[in-house]
From Swiss-Prot:
GO-annotated biological processes: DNA replication
Gene3D superfamilies per the UniProt record, alphabetical: 1.10.150.870, Bacterial DNA polymerase III alpha subunit, thumb domain, Metal-dependent hydrolases
GO MF term list: 3'-5' exonuclease activity; DNA-directed DNA polymerase activity
InterPro entries: DNA_pol3_alpha_NTPase_dom, DNA_pol3_alpha_thumb_dom, DNA_pol3_finger, DnaE2/DnaE/PolC, DNAPol_HHH, PHP_dom, Pol/His_phosphatase_N, Pol/histidinol_Pase-like
Compartments in which it is found: Cytoplasm
Signal peptide segment: none
E.C. number(s) listed in UniProt: 2.7.7.7
The name this protein goes by in its record: DNA polymerase III subunit alpha
Top-level division of the source organism's lineage: Bacteria
Organism per entry: Rickettsia felis (strain ATCC VR-1525 / URRWXCal2)
Subunit structure: DNA polymerase III contains a core (composed of alpha, epsilon and theta chains) that associates with a tau subunit. This core dimerizes to form the PolIII' complex. PolIII' associates with the gamma complex (composed of gamma, delta, delta', psi and chi chains) and with the beta chain to form the complete DNA polymerase III complex.
Cellular component aspect of the GO annotation: cytoplasm
Paired cysteines (S-S): none
Amino acid sequence: MRPEFIHLRTQSSYSFLESALTIEKVVELASSNKMPAICLADKGNLFGSLEFALYAVKKGLQPIHGVILNIKYDIDIFAQILLIAKDETGYKNLLKLSSLTFTKNDRKLCDHIDFEDLIEYQEGLIALCCYTDGIVGKCLLARSEEQAMLFARKLQDILGDRFYFEIMRHDLPEEQFIEDSYIRIAAELAIPLVATNKVLFSEKTMHDAHDVLLCISAGVTKEYPDRKTVSENCYFRSPHEMIELFSDLPSAIQNTVNLRERCYFAAHANPPMLPNFATKDISETDLIRKDAKEGLLARLATKFKSENIPLQNQEELKTEYFARLNYELDIICNMNFAGYFLIVSDFIKWSKKEGILVGPGRGSGAGSVVAWSLLITDLDPIKFGLLFERFLNPERISMPDFDIDFCQERREEVINYVRSKYGNNRVGQIITFGKMQAKAVIKDVARVLSLPYKFADYLTELVPFSAVNPVSLEQAMREVPELANAAKGNGLYNLEGEAELIKLVLDTSLILEGLHRHSSTHAAGIVIAGTDLVDIVPVYKDANSDMLVVGYSMKYSEIAGLIKFDFLGLQTLTVITDCKKLLKEQGIEVDFNNMTFDDNKTYQMLCKGKGVGVFQFESIGMKDALRRLKPDSIHDLIALGALYRPGPMENIPTYIACKHKLQQPDYLHELLKPILEETYGVVIYQEQVQRIAQILAGYTLGAADLLRRAMGKKIKKEMEEQEEIFVKGAIANNISESQAKSIFATVAKFAGYGFNKAHAAAYGVISYQTAYLKANYPAEFLVACLNLELNNHDKINLFLQEAKDSGIKIIAPNINISEGYFSVKSVIPQAATCHPQGPLCHPRVGGYPEKVKTVLNHESMKMDSRFCGNDIKGSRNDIEDTGYDKEKSTIIFALGAIKGVTPNFGKLVTDERKARGAFKSITDFIERLPLKSINSKLLENLIKSGCFDELHDNRLQLFSSISKLLAYSASYHAEQESNQFSLIKVSSLSPNILIASDYADNNTLAFYEFESMGLFISNHPLTQYQEIFSRLNILNTADLHNNLPDGTNRVNLAGVIQKKDSRMSARGRFVTLVLSDPENIFELSIFSEEVLKDYVHLLDVKSLVVVNCDIVKDEGGIKLTAKSFSSIEDAINNKQFELQLYPQNHEELRQIVTLLAARTNNRDQSNAKATIYLQSEGVKNFVAKITLPEKFFLQGQDFEILKGYSK
């Protein structure tokens, strides 16, 4: 039966934020309406064309490919044209025209084509003139029928009988206005009419939800005037509705069917299309065999030398390695993958030649001897027991996939090399599509419908978060009762009218969820084709980039025949590169190519859990695992990297116990001991599963890979089939059926979360390399880490703490020493010594008499110097001396790590110092730097960070004088530029521009630093309280790891709140706090609403608090949960202290008495009593005891001062 009507104007969500239909929905609507074909014509792109074609064919429908493009028909005037592919030539021209809209140079007003483009690529295309949005329609709306006729003839001349007049009836006045003229022109020029309907949503009831979608696109609310809207009739009208609507124009309906019959092409899958690496002299197959054999000989020569392998053993090893090489080469060449290996090898060899650090391997590719020989990987697969079949299985043909890690800073250079070698038109990135997921769509819809923010925020926080598998809104409603109730209109708050609006928000969000919102590019994927990309796929180009982007997602790019290469930027490789560069400047060369993984210092450091900065080993739980494991070989590091994941983590205690001979390994069967001995009986790796199947049940390694995959997927039918094969093979190997089934069950359990050993080994090597650098060259390594995290103040704090713990000196920001980035110096000028800010504790209200200032200059009251000072060592002594000369290793704080200061400004400062010497004063600094380089915020943060302490010891005075300093700068530079003579030079006024000011107290200085750098570098607000904390049983964070048993404990900690983060979960609101004390930064959670309510006044950033909390310490690390809070002042004031003081002479006695006298002026409040013990200078062993009758009200710093007189 001949169809009655075909929709030719259906748009999907690839018309971003314009259509509320997915590809699947478009096809399902056509199928349910008994249409044998459907045309997808998205606005401006063909991103969904292959997905559409494959899905339509799967459902038994004919896909018709179309696209709606802008065409320029006058100066800066555009209209729409709908182009449809008639055949393969037409589809290729459709690809070219749609891609041209993104790659033309004149995209300023909109993406478009010109008439010249249409003339060049018209072959195989059918065109519809888009009614009111088209050229003819726009001319008629402008009452220019003559112009309409002119352009109609022009399009007819270009396309002939492949040009149609599209007519629509959405009940819009503009359509009705032009219809008669439109039909008359069509008749006069004999251009066929074709009836269409804009299909943007499935049914009329979806109009309101679609209207919200348009508001999201425009960034406006529904109440916004003059916003874009569409007719409620832009839904998927049935054939019956369309026939009835155009009953007066039956030919327009019939022409939809006729047009469909002219189209006979559908996009389809293609075989892989790679550039041909062969030359006229040698084929790809011969070339890979030649390069691989030469490469293996070079690898073995290096191996024999670095591992001191005796000459008599070398021939045997050569035989083993070449046998494996030839086996792999045969498989690679038979699968026609030689070109792929050669392409990867080429750009990696180029990278290494250019000094760009490449990772030793990533993923299963590290298991290939061919890859090792071609320098693709740097891991000896046979030495590490890696399997080629895990990478390329001869029994399951699929494309190989090398993921390559490059130094992040130089990754673009490699991509540019590939572009230059194969051509810019043949290399491209891969597009990705951002979807409207549950949380985001609720926020978008709530904003459009003007739902108050607090309700929208509450709703979104109720949706559970999962980075790996985002939770759908429908799923969240099933799992979260509050969300389900809201969707039923029960409401979240007792506010009239809000329940109904909340229900509308959720109902609309359910309709729009999953639609495409925008496009971006894949983080690492690059495709390389053997022909221009636009011959195969649509291409896209971002206006800010000159690199092509494939318009299909990764999945459909591969189906189209494009091969993806992952060029990944790994920050750790940048750290290694930068560290080696710093060492090279000192004449130290580190060669990782010949590393033997046996450095004692490295393992000593790891055994102590010193994992900060070490690749894979930075988390608290991993550091704890290192302490318990006490690794002494690269195999331990590889195993731990594979085990430290949900699931396998439960086997860490077994691995550790067996390693330290506290438990006997279970090898399952004596035949399996050679396979499991390395991991103490624990099945960790997928390769072990393959070996077990091979040894025990006679599987080939290829078949064993299929078994591994089946076990990983846990598909019941496949598992049953594999178990039968496994048991039969084991029985043939003289193993009982019951034991075979038992082993199969055990292996299946492990295989479910088994890890790829090739990947674990490659990343284990990177872990070892970073650990080696840190253990042997800690200052240079930490500087490299710091410079990579220049804008992450939490990480900077962490790395500086690690430097302190390692006994490395750190110099605080100094305008005469610091550079744009962190640096390492071996000799520091004397001026760089960390020094006090004049009298650090400025007299307080009702404060100290003049004589007491001598007490305040006690050593305990000097600048805390947690990090800085030429003579400051780490506070912990758990690191053995590694032989590293720490006296020659001082880290200089970076100017670029100060807020509002860039590394470029730091370079400006450094260059000026090199050219004209150190800065002599604040005004000298301002005079010598360009006027435009300094602004108020920059100067403020430089002052607060202490950069100018060497030039001027009163930060508060400089801070108070910022406006005067900037005014002076402007006047000085204006005078310099004018070059005019003046009796009074501006520079002569410089000594008088600073406003008189007292010195800031310790706390003010500490928070100056926190505000400017996000951390406390030379002062910490809690340093002055350390003595009193010990009296109050308030622990230091260092005690948490060292002195507490495993399990749950209740402790008191003190800290300064540095960050506060409020979140929602299905169980309610919780808050995460980041705090610091003089030793560490730590994090704790508050789950109790009651705690949040009772102590909300104490939980502001910068608050000094004492927290009573539960601490859970286990193999996963330490977790802190707050139970109550108090301010530092309350904690001190609510306790009565008894002091015993022992002055050694009259001067000390006078200082004590003066200080205590200053603390007796508040008799209504006291927290201390004092007893003084005096020793007579003339009578041996005579001590006078004086109990003072007064009670005193002491503060934190007082206890620190008086500590010097206690025993």
